[in-house]
Amino acid sequence: MTLRSAEEGREYTVRSVDTGDEEMDSFLFSLGCYAGEPITVVSHLKGSCVVSIKDGRYTIDRALADTVAVG
């Protein structure tokens, strides 16, 4: 399952991140979005997804949300 299809308000564990872009993978890693870390989907908005990672909230677009596998 990816972040795009994840249920709002539920905490998941990041299983993998594969954007196909090393720079974007590094950016997500710097936010704390990497395998084994908890992530919560706060809400799904039109064209984007709001997530909580560690102590921050971030809005990511649908394409990026599709690259983050959670379980």
Predicted features and spans:
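Absolute protein N-terminus
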Residues: 1-2, 71
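A residue-level detector for short acidic-glycine micro-motifs
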Residues: 5, 16, 41-43
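Contiguous, function-dense segments enriched for cysteine-driven chemistry
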Residues: 10-16
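Short alpha-helix capping/helix-loop boundary micro-motifs
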Residues: 23-27
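C-terminal structural segments of small proteins and small subunits
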Residues: 42-71
